[in-house]
Regions:
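Active-site-proximal beta-strand elements of phosphoester/diester hydrolases
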Residues: 1, 84-90, 130-136
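Active-site metal-binding motif and surrounding structural segment of the metallo-beta-lactamase
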Residues: 2-44, 150-160
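Flexible, charged surface loops at secondary-structure boundaries
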Residues: 5-8, 30, 80, 124-125, ...
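Divalent metal-coordination and catalytic microenvironments
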Residues: 16, 37, 83, 134-135
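Active-site environment of divalent metal-dependent phosphoester hydrolases
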Residues: 18-23, 44-47, 79, 138-142, ...
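Metal-dependent catalytic neighborhoods of phosphoester/phosphodiester hydrolases
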Residues: 23-32, 54-57, 170-178
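Cap/insert and terminal regions of metallo-dependent hydrolase folds
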Residues: 36, 115-121, 125-186
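Metallo-beta-lactamase
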Residues: 43-120
Length: 186
């Protein structure tokens, strides 16, 4: 679609371990036999969406374990080179989206709320400018931006992210007040 030859890609990043982001990973790995895929070490957690009417697994497909030699498991801040840095473990819950409330991690027989320890964000620096890539931004774009500023020592020049302000499982958007408050912080 973007006229990119995926066989020539030499590095990839997984934003988090929900199947709407990792669902195409096996197809990519079959097509491309060399790219390393950077992801958080917590990607193999048991992630679910839980609503009053369903409990469905939304984590990594077990077939992806066949490609573990291609995965680079990260934790915290990892500077790959002068251009690429991944970071995770975003603290804070400022302007946290209620859309996260249905997302859970199965631990034993319990389903506590997902802490998003499997989510990571990417900083790309080129020609003195830095862009932040934040996937769904489950940890909250305001909190992620604060962490990016801590890593960089300044705000990024551009942000590319989903803000996760809509819950597709419930068909419900966040209140206008939350959306406006997030917009004001940006």
């Amino acid at each position: 679609a973007l006229s990119v030859d995926l066989t020539q890609v030499d590095i990839a990043f997984l934003s988090h371990a929900h199947n709407d982001h990792c669902g195409g990973l096996e197809a990519f790995l079959k097509l491309n036999d060399r790219a390393k895929v950077y992801m958080q070490k917590a990607v193999w957690g048991q992630y679910y969406v839980v609503t009053p009417s369903k409990c469905a697994y939304i984590g990594m497909d077990a077939v992806l374990k066949n490609y573990e030699d291609r995965f680079v498991l990260c934790d915290g801040v990892q500077k790959l080179d002068e251009e690429l840095t991944v970071f995770s473990a975003v603290p804070g819950r400022e302007l946290w989206s209620g859309a996260n409330d249905t997302l859970r991690e199965k631990i034993g027989e319990d389903y506590p709320r997902d802490t998003f320890r499997h989510e990571q964000d990417l900083l790309v620096t080129e020609n003195g400018k830095t862009a932040l890539f934040a996937g769904c931004a489950h940890c909250g774009i305001v909190n992620i931006l604060k962490s990016a500023e801590d890593v960089l020592g300044r705000a990024p020049d551009a942000v590319f992210a989903g803000f996760h302000l809509y819950n597709p499982s419930l068909g419900k958007s966040e209140p206008d007040e939350l959306v406006d408050a997030v917009g004001e912080k940006l």
